[in-house]
Amino acid sequence: MVSPIIDVKHLDYRYPQQATDQLTLHDISFTVMPGEWVAIVGHNGSGKSTLAKNLNGLLAPAAGTITVDGQVLSEETVWDIRRKIGMVFQNPDNQFVGATVADDVAFSLENQGVPRSEMLTRVQAALEQVNMQDFATREPARLSGGQKQRVALAGMIAARPQILILDEATSMLDPRGRQEVLTTIRDMKANSALTVLSITHDIDEAASANRVLVINDGEVKEEGTPAEIFQHGEALIKMGLDMPYAERLKAALKRQGVQVPAQYLTEKGMADWLWQLRSNK
């Protein structure tokens, strides 16, 4: 039987300035299986980014356990676990350290002591995978937001983590940049057994995941497939979230007497279905 690659049990967290009876995270429990894409959604201040920082040891929980690939997260294991996790943050400008795109992608490999010949091969392959090979000698500051996040993802590809955590990685991007990043992640998953955990308030992004956790007031309120979660439209709105564009479009079509198959959860899926519907007329 396959074991979870992430296993969180009864996790509590409070910030130092909080009173002892106040918790930012309360009794959080969930698992993530190898190769799964799980989206953790919630409004700003719900606790989802605090959870992400607990998962890779940037913050230490007040109670509960986090197990990653069979290792319980602790002061003794944190560096081993961090080697298994790649993290892409909200602001791409905060994660660049190299003078050029290629230098930045190579940074984590230098820290790992990867031989130079292998490093060059992995950097080139990673940039090709995110379609940024023509920008290898560019300064990161001169890239667009979507390009910067694709370079950050290239750094993760080159480092070959088992788990990729995206902490609001698309929230500062325009729609085109957001789509570039999500397409890159789908391609990464198609080419490897990568496990993805995306922390987001963008309910449309969650439609790409295999499973969705909804966090509100520091607690897991809902868990299920995107289709199951999107059925709880009113509950999501009460928690400060919106319904995905595809679901709003479905509702509008149903009001016009057009029945839409339930499996179309994304804008692209709906566009393809509408085009097929039009072509059949």
From Swiss-Prot:
Keyword Transport: yes
Keywords, comma-separated and alphabetical: ATP-binding, Cell membrane, Membrane, Nucleotide-binding, Translocase, Transport
Domain of life: Bacteria
Cellular component per GO, a single term: ATP-binding cassette (ABC) transporter complex
InterPro entries tied to this protein: AAA+_ATPase, ABC_transporter-like_ATP-bd, ABC_transporter-like_CS, ABC_transpr_CbiO/EcfA_su, ECF_ABC_transporter_ATP-bd, EcfA_1, P-loop_NTPase
UniProt xrefs under Gene3D superfamilies: P-loop containing nucleotide triphosphate hydrolases (3.40.50.300)
UniProt cross-references to Pfam families, sorted A to Z: ABC_tran (PF00005)
Gene Ontology MF term list: ATP binding; ATP hydrolysis activity; ATPase-coupled transmembrane transporter activity
Membrane topology: Peripheral membrane protein
Main subcellular localisation: membrane
Residues annotated as domain ABC transporter: 6-242
Binding site for ATP: 42-49
EC number assigned by the record: 7.-.-.-
PROSITE patterns listed in its UniProt record: ABC_TRANSPORTER_1, ABC_TRANSPORTER_2, CBIO
Keyword Translocase: yes
Role: ATP-binding (A) component of a common energy-coupling factor (ECF) ABC-transporter complex. Unlike classic ABC transporters this ECF transporter provides the energy necessary to transport a number of different substrates.
Family: Belongs to the ABC transporter superfamily. Energy-coupling factor EcfA family.
Subunit structure: Forms a stable energy-coupling factor (ECF) transporter complex composed of 2 membrane-embedded substrate-binding proteins (S component), 2 ATP-binding proteins (A component) and 2 transmembrane proteins (T component).
NCBIfam families listed in its UniProt record: ECF_ATPase_1 (TIGR04520), PRK13635.1 (NF010156), PRK13648.1 (NF010167)
Name of the featured protein: Energy-coupling factor transporter ATP-binding protein EcfA1
